[in-house]
Amino acid sequence: MLKNAPYKFSEFESMSIQYGNCDSLVNKYDSKTGDYQYLNRADSLVKMKLHLSKDDLLYLHRKAADLGFWDFPVDETGDSVKAGAKQPVRYIIEFKYQRKSKKVVFDTNFDGDIRLIDANLGVIKEINQVLNKVEGDQKK
């Protein structure tokens, strides 16, 4: 099955995630450059270089495959003008490979299949866990 997968890790180039309010995606990570920035609990912008190992990237590649990321719709945005709606958090996740790439835009107020929403949240959770682990290891 893995040999016929449309996205092969041997062709992997980079992974990136951006998230925040729809008008300002201030939280960002790019595995190609190692640029990582996020708002901490004190609302201060933290910037650093954070390089993921090949094993970390392989783990994320496999988790994305397990959760069905390659089959996610490209546009999973919610209704941002709904009366009384809280502004959603927008996530832009992209995996780049030599021959193709997959980019998904997901809003937390996306009104789709609950399984798809859970799968998106699963990919986001896995990426954040890896980033937090590597950042914690780097501080030691």
State what each model feature region is.
Residues 1-54:
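N-terminal export/targeting and maturation segments
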Residues 1-19, 77-140:
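Short, well-ordered, aromatic-rich surface patches in folded extracellular/luminal domains
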Residues 42, 56, 64, 97-99, ...:
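A mature extracytoplasmic/lumenal domain signature
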Residues 47-82:
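Mature extracytoplasmic domains of secretory-pathway proteins
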Residues 33, 52-55, 106-113:
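A short, sequence-level motif marking secondary-structure junctions
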